[in-house]
Amino acid sequence: MVSFSLLRTTRPLQRCGQLVCMAARAQHSKVAQTQAGEAAGGWTGQESLSDSDPEMWELLQREKDRQCRGLELIASENFCSRAALEALGSCLNNKYSEGYPGKRYYGGAEVVDEIELLCQRRALEAFDLDPAQWGVNVQPYSGSPANLAAYTALLQPHDRIMGLDLPDGGHLTHGYMSDVKRISATSIFFESMPYKLNPQTGLIDYDQLALTARLFRPRLIIAGTSAYARLIDYARMREVCDEVRAHLLADMAHISGLVAAKVIPSPFKYADVVTTTTHKTLRGARSGLIFYRKGVRTVDPKTGKEIPYTFEDRINFAVFPSLQGGPHNHAIAAVAVALKQACTPMFREYSLQVLRNAQAMADALLKRGYSLVSGGTDTHLVLVDLRPKGLDGARAERVLELVSITANKNTCPGDRSAITPGGLRLGAPALTSRQFREDDFRRVVDFIDEGVNIGLEVKRKTAKLQDFKSFLLKDPETSQRLANLRQQVEQFARGFPMPGFDER
């Protein structure tokens, strides 16, 4: 297995080789384009983006530069491999293929049938699932459509569901609604009741969840989070589901890469259905997956007849034709590439490093006096509660953005405002993909702390959030401090390699 340190040493040499090859290909391609254009006397579709649309090309270059010179700490983001990006930008974008392998509504689907079947096989292999007991639909466009398709398959309109409350670390699609409005489509089409964290421990309150479930009698309980740094007790949630006769759906969108690498517990032993995105810790293209149990569910004690699971047909029908049309074949191929990568020893080492880096970041924050929801982390992220510091996540996010550190404001338990929530969510996956190690994350915390201190000083001088943002740009002393910190951050960040394409 190649070590991270060796990769760090050899990557610049690899990049040089890639640039030489790219230059040769570009020269050959340009000649071919010119010849083809002259022969056809018009549009050939072979024009490069830089030639065809310089304005868009420049925007892409600016975004690539932003990613290279900045520190990406948004927990739901990662850097996709060049191999997966090549599949994503391939001729598969051209093919329409409504339906499923062997049952398409369009001709010419023999190759995309093979691609979809390969993606299904790799998805099951990545999570060590027996094809006789589990199936997977790889067509959902992303995580939210995957969840809605699963709900559509498992529930009737206005059936009851329970999910972790959004301010406590849940996700919009788990049924969130405010005091005055149903926000998520899940809460519009189904009746939702949240479960919450224990305010003293910052952990999911499983006892209260069980009590609420006995009263609410949900048809579905969702085990999944978007800003919760601890492991989920799937066994306990299975007990609750069995007691109230509810399905258990595990949404592992944030942690699926860690599950595939076997560095945290898997939900598959306990869940009926498992959904996930593919671009977070799994480090693939943006898409969604729905896993479902199949085979024998139980045996009728009176007749001895086997009773099968019925999820497969219901989920497939919910995805197509109920909610989607033609699948995105280019995305399915790119996901298949990422799933193959997820089965390698290198990916397991990456996932272990994600956990080590998140822990190092949490420890460094605690040593600097920051408060973390639940007191730490077991996963890829930490949720910082800035309220004891006297700052909010919106102000911290803006300061960090101005110094090329990308994080996101996030609600903490007890928050009443999504505009100025008390939390800041920080994730390790993206920078770990750039080969950051523990000491590098401790340095990142130094930068964050300096940014927070700037934010605290400016907050004392301003009232409203808009005044705060304006002061950051207009006050000469503050602007200079931000510029100095930004220079340090960018100089540090540029010392690490970037996955994907080298456009420049």
Swiss-Prot record:
Residues 1-29 form a transit peptide. It is found in: Mitochondrion; Mitochondrion matrix, Mitochondrion nucleoid; Mitochondrion inner membrane; Cytoplasm. Coiled coil: none annotated. The modification N6-(pyridoxal phosphate)lysine is found at residue 280. Gene3D superfamilies: Aspartate Aminotransferase, domain 1 (3.90.1150.10), Type I PLP-dependent aspartate aminotransferase-like (Major domain) (3.40.640.10). Hydroxymethyltransferase is inhibited by succinylation at Lys-280. Pathway: One-carbon metabolism; tetrahydrofolate interconversion. It comes from the Eukaryota. Succinylation at Lys-280 inhibits the hydroxymethyltransferase activity. Desuccinylation by SIRT5 restores the activity, leading to promote cell proliferation. GO terms for molecular function: amino acid binding; chromatin binding; glycine hydroxymethyltransferase activity; identical protein binding; L-allo-threonine aldolase activity; pyridoxal phosphate binding. GO terms for cellular component: BRISC complex; microtubule cytoskeleton; mitochondrial inner membrane; mitochondrial matrix; mitochondrial nucleoid; mitochondrion; nucleus. Keywords: Acetylation, Cytoplasm, Membrane, Mitochondrion, Mitochondrion inner membrane, Mitochondrion nucleoid, Nucleus, One-carbon metabolism, Phosphoprotein, Pyridoxal phosphate, Transferase, Transit peptide. PANTHER family: SERINE HYDROXYMETHYLTRANSFERASE (PTHR11680), SERINE HYDROXYMETHYLTRANSFERASE, MITOCHONDRIAL (PTHR11680:SF28). Catalyzes the cleavage of serine to glycine accompanied with the production of 5,10-methylenetetrahydrofolate, an essential intermediate for purine biosynthesis. Serine provides the major source of folate one-carbon in cells by catalyzing the transfer of one carbon from serine to tetrahydrofolate. Contributes to the de novo mitochondrial thymidylate biosynthesis pathway via its role in glycine and tetrahydrofolate metabolism: thymidylate biosynthesis is required to prevent uracil accumulation in mtDNA. In eukaryotes there are two forms of the enzymes: a cytosolic one and a mitochondrial one. Belongs to the SHMT family. This is Serine hydroxymethyltransferase, mitochondrial. It comes from Mus musculus (Mouse). The gene is Shmt2.
